[in-house]
């Protein structure tokens, strides 16, 4: 499951009303109940975005832990060019997320912004929907 950057922000920055579901997803990844994937470019984005919530030292610690919890889908020329050529995504970063999900053979992209991924080749799911789906299995 490729986890969109906004889910990680929700969990780490404790953004309500989204934090609980985001934390549960991260816990399932940490417990290896599901395979969580982060796109490599999410790491520097998180480092920058979380500067309002955490010191540099805290961010380094948190992001290092994320690298232990999640598989990191690397960013390479092939993915960058494919995302640039994919006009289905108006947001280049979302196109990169989708390319990482495709190459990692992810079953889902979990995000709070499914409209951003309406043309995704990978099924897109909201956090609460993912948690309900996991409870069924």
Annotate each language-model stretch with its function.
Residues 1-37, 51-61, 119, 131-137:
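Short, well-structured N-terminal submotif of metal-dependent ribonuclease cores
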Residues 102-137:
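Acidic, PIN/NYN-like endoribonuclease modules and their adjacent C-terminal/linker elements
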């Amino acid at each position: 499951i490729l986890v969109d950057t906004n889910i990680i922000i929700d969990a780490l920055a404790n953004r309500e009303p989204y934090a609980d579901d985001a934390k549960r997803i991260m816990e399932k990844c940490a417990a290896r109940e599901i395979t969580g994937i982060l796109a490599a470019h999410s790491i520097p984005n998180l480092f920058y975005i979380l500067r309002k919530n955490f010191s540099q030292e805290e961010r380094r610690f948190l992001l290092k832990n994320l690298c232990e919890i999640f598989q990191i889908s690397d960013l390479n020329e092939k993915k960058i060019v494919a995302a640039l050529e994919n006009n289905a995504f108006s947001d280049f970063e979302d196109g990169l997320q989708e390319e990482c999900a495709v190459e990692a053979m992810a079953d889902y992209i979990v995000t709070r912004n499914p409209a951003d991924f309406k043309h995704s080749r990978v099924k897109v799911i909201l956090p609460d929907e993912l948690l309900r789906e996991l409870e069924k299995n």
